[in-house]
Amino acid sequence: MQSKGTIISIQFLLRFLLLWVLIGKSHTEEDIIITTKNGKVRGMNLPVLDGTVTAFLGIPYAQPPLGRLRFKKPQFLTKWSDIWNATKYANSCYQNADQSFPGFPGSEMWNPNTDLSEDCLYLNVWIPTPKPKNATVMIWIYGGGFQTGTSSLPVYDGKFLARVERVIVVSMNYRVGALGFLALPGNPEVPGNMGLFDQQLALQWVQKNIAAFGGNPKSVTLFGESAGAGSVSLHLLSPRSQPLFTRAILQSGSSNAPWAVMSLDEAKNRTLTLAKFIGCSKENDTEIIKCLRNKDPQEILLNELLVVPSDTLLSVNFGPVVDGDFLTDMPDTLLQLGQFKKTQILVGVNKDEGTAFLVYGAPGFSKDNDSIITRKEFQEGLKIYFPGVSEFGREAILFYYVDLLDDQRAEKYREALDDVLGDYNIICPALEFTTKFSELGNNAFFYYFEHRSSQLPWPEWMGVMHGYEIEFVFGLPLERRVNYTRAEEILSRSIMNYWANFAKYGNPNGTQNNSTRWPAFRSTDQKYLTLNAESPKVYTKLRAQQCRFWTLFFPKVLEMTGNIDEAEREWRAGFYRWNNYMMDWKNQFNDYTSKKESCAGL
């Protein structure tokens, strides 16, 4: 039989436990419902590893760009009175899905996984628990060539990064393709760069609201991959964006890459071409815009694919443009003038940046075989990827990447075309961008990612592909059910720590003394760190010879031989005319001679 004292103790304990549950419940609800400048939002707690992360998915940050707002800059939101239920991802922005390899995980993983809609301007926030105070914020911008992409892909899930590094992770949707980048420069109804202005408005939202989530608006790092990295570097160049963030991470992309920004004339020509295809050729811009706004978005999607010739690969149909507003000049010019945000940057590339593009139409390439191509197929590939380059220019590439090496291996042409595309489009522009930054005394860090994921569904010959460092940045190998190796989990934790340290302190080494310290990148020695499942190593001057070819030699070849094809055509036409004249003269002379001989016999 229990004593009276024991009963009292049990009652006290039960009351204490009840009070603890109630307080805990109240505290949890307080953390899950946050008051933003536009109204309250409700998130949800997610179990992550041995703890919890609170996720807010699908928070609106702009008015839906529908009807008369199509093609315009994003508009500020009005307030709402109810609690916004931010517990599932929102719509993805309209885009053409990749249908090249139906059902294949390697391509399907990048396709949108939520409904497509023009009502797509939403963002996501992951915060560690308990809710932090003044935590560093990392804002992710997805890639996709400015034509595709969505923040809801599993590979962009911010929960592991938030949990392990106790940072706040934010991602946003932005408009892509013609709906995001159609441009009639100078016309406020279709200014161009709408997708970039979407991103910029999301950055403003973070500045106004992130403190309510426990974040520090004065410690905000942008990070992105491919066109997302191109976007990040454009924010570094844009005076309007510069006050909205602190640091920047560029993964396999930069704004000075040949695909990143197009000229005003090219942007307008593509707009008028799309208008023609879609039946909106009108007498003036006002009528064109009115017609385009009345078209079904699916019709716009189908026709925007036709704007660039189908035999041209690695092209951006609609992308960033120098509008005099978001972007005041071409990135190369702004870099030369030093007109960019003075801050710290972390930049890097993957070992085999080119292979991801080869299986989408390069002659002789396939994901289903070893793609051992011939010299002729290599030359045909150069024609496709360098459509405006003279034959002399293409021969210079062939000589430098193949003939000069005297490589006798069967795979030499395959590997050479991978290197050509990777160096020209990704690696050398990224190195040039980093060099220009560091020359003005800004701290820069460069990495070379060389680990091929054990879960990669693409064939072995494609190597360490474009885009496949992202899963390690976001901590996917920490999910035990996915069967990554232990070494890959360690690599992922290391990369997350480097990224978070950089975001917090401007230095990936953080405040700890690691066994291998990541040195700053200087224009003189160009030190960089390898990231792999073994041990990181420091080297200097990544692909320096190849990048000198692209930055110094190749432009001179184009300058000297750019008109040779045209000159040759003119010469051939002239020769043909001369040859015809000569044949005509010869016929007339023969006729004259025969008549003369006839006359002589009379």
From Swiss-Prot:
UniProt subcellular location: Secreted
Keywords, in A-Z order: Disulfide bond, Glycoprotein, Hydrolase, Phosphoprotein, Secreted, Serine esterase, Signal
First-listed, main subcellular location of the protein, grouped into a coarse class: secreted
UniProt cross-references to CDD domains, sorted A to Z: Esterase_lipase
Catalytic residues in the record: S226, E353, H466
Binding site residues for substrate: G144, G145
Record PROSITE patterns: CARBOXYLESTERASE_B_1 (PS00122), CARBOXYLESTERASE_B_2 (PS00941)
EC annotation from Swiss-Prot or TrEMBL: 3.1.1.8
Cited InterPro entries: AB_hydrolase_fold, AChE-related_enzymes, AChE_tetra, CarbesteraseB, Carboxylesterase_B_AS, Carboxylesterase_B_CS, Cholinesterase
Catalytic activity: an acylcholine + H2O = a carboxylate + choline + H(+)
One Gene Ontology term, aspect cellular component: plasma membrane
Disulfide bond positions: C93-C120, C280-C291, C428-C547
Protein task: Esterase with broad substrate specificity. Contributes to the inactivation of the neurotransmitter acetylcholine. Can degrade neurotoxic organophosphate esters.
Family of the protein in this entry: Belongs to the type-B carboxylesterase/lipase family.
Name by which UniProt lists this protein: Cholinesterase
Gene: BCHE
